[in-house]
Structures are given as structure tokens and as C-alpha cells.
Amino acid sequence: MEPIRIGIGGPVGAGKTMLVEKLTRAMHKELSIAVVTNDIYTKEDAQFLLKHGVLPADRVIGVETGGCPHTAIREDASMNFPAIDELKERHPDLELIFIESGGDNLAATFSPELVDFSIYIIDVAQGEKIPRKGGQGMIKSVLFIINKIDLAPYVGASLEVMERDTLAARGDKPYIFTNLKDEIGLAEVLEWIKTNALLYGLES
């Protein structure tokens, strides 16, 4: 059976790599997991995961995309496929692959050929206007995460305004407020993945 592929996108510094690290740490004992990271000219995110995470090196592959990072997840997603195939060859029992995009703008989206589900993450420090600006990454993602809520008082951002604008832009599509550093909201993200992507709890 093919592993489920979940894309994680968002601007530089929003918390993509930390989200991947927290999710893999929480799930690696119950699932066979691997990660593909996309960086423009380095493999820094992959190296961070290997240093701070729980997955061994043979389960993490860094792809150097060059140029615009959204190209590697949308227009020319093919550069990710060899990494996915290599991970599947190394681990025939693979059940879940996280594909982290390089930091990009609000318009970046994942090709449906590359991922089964997409998560888009922003952080409060970028300003409360971000949800109002919309952007295809935020609007089209299956799950939207607003991270670093602990910083709201320090940057003058209103979580109520961000929630209102998120509802206006996304309708009834799910969103979660998080402070991943302190794992606030992490349980809700895990629950969403297990229920919606992995279909936990469904009768066979």
C-alpha cells in the first residue's frame, strides 16, 4: 500500500520544521514515517531534523531545489519523486511521508500529484493581517495552522481578528492555533492527522 503523503508549507520561520519534528516525535513509535525536506541551496532543515529529531538518517532526505521553492512542490514537483521512491525502497513498510516545502510566499501550494493532504502554517509574528491577505497556500490547504500565539501580545496581534479573517477566507475548513515550542495545540494537529489523513477510528 502506498504511504500517505502530507505536505507542510508556509513562509520562512513560521515553524514548518518544528512542526515536522514534533509530529514525527509523537508518531514514530506507532507508524513507519519518513520526511522529505525542500531547501533552496542547502539541506539545513534535513540536518536540523537529524540533530534534534527522532528519525534516523535513512528516513530523512533533503532536496536542494534551487531558485523558487514553490516550483519544487507545484510546477516541477518531479524533483521530489526520486526522494520519495528512495524512501519507499529503503522502507517497504512506509506508512506516512511528510514533505516540507522551502519557505515561500502565501501563494505557494502543493501539487495534488505530490501530496494527499496539505497543511499550511503561518506565525503570529508576521502580523494579524496575514489571514486577511488570503493567498492560495492558506486558502487551499486542508488544514491551516496559526503558530506562535504566545507572541501575540508582543507584536500587537489580535488572535480574535486572525480567527475572524481565517473563517472569512476558509469557510468551514479546519484551522488550529498553536505554540509549537510549548506544544500548545500539537495534540489537536495530531488528532486531525490521525482522523482525517490516516482515518483512525473508522470501522473497517
Swiss-Prot record:
Pfam families named among the record's database cross-references: cobW (PF02492)
Role noted for this protein: Facilitates the functional incorporation of the urease nickel metallocenter. This process requires GTP hydrolysis, probably effectuated by UreG.
BP-aspect Gene Ontology terms: urea catabolic process
GO (cellular component) term, any one: cytoplasm
Family note: Belongs to the SIMIBI class G3E GTPase family. UreG subfamily.
Gene Ontology MF annotations: GTP binding; GTPase activity; nickel cation binding
Name of the protein described by the UniProt record: Urease accessory protein UreG
Chaperone found in the keyword field: yes
Organism: Bacillus sp. (strain TB-90)
Annotated positions binding GTP: G10, P11, V12, G13, A14, G15, K16, T17
Localization (cell): Cytoplasm
